[in-house]
Amino acid sequence: RCSRDWSSDVCSSDLIDYGFPESEYYHPQRTGGTLMCHHAHTSDPDPLVGIGEKDITAHVNFTGIALAGQDAGWEVLGYTSQGRFLYNCGLGEALARTGQASTANELRDRSALQKLVAEHEMGELFKVVGFVKGEWFDAIGFAHGDRSHTL
């Protein structure tokens, strides 16, 4: 969300990715780092096997992202899980209003939404950090379950 008025610039930005705060990112038990490769519903840590056949990914250091944002003049609005963020933004109420899924498409859509918020799926794996530049505002996505203190 960005707007411009006569006196100041106000912008906010949310970053959604999978990762950890620094204390978890550099945890002593994470000796192999966070690099992972994915292919055909399997994963492994070796990007040199099956070159060109796998997606290569790594988790992000959300503490580093927050510090970089602050160095650039942004303030952290909040940090939470994707599931909590979506529920704070009203996803639970929206699902309740739709009632029971009655068609295959509705069931598929509801299942996809559940995957976004379920703790054992993307809901906890993915995190959201919000930034603001300019005038501070209360961001509803971080109203409950803010974990900024862990950054």
List where the protein language model places each region.
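Single conserved hydrophobic/aromatic residue that forms the stacking wall/gate
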Residues: 1-11
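Rossmann-like AdoMet/SAM-dependent catalytic core
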Residues: 9-151
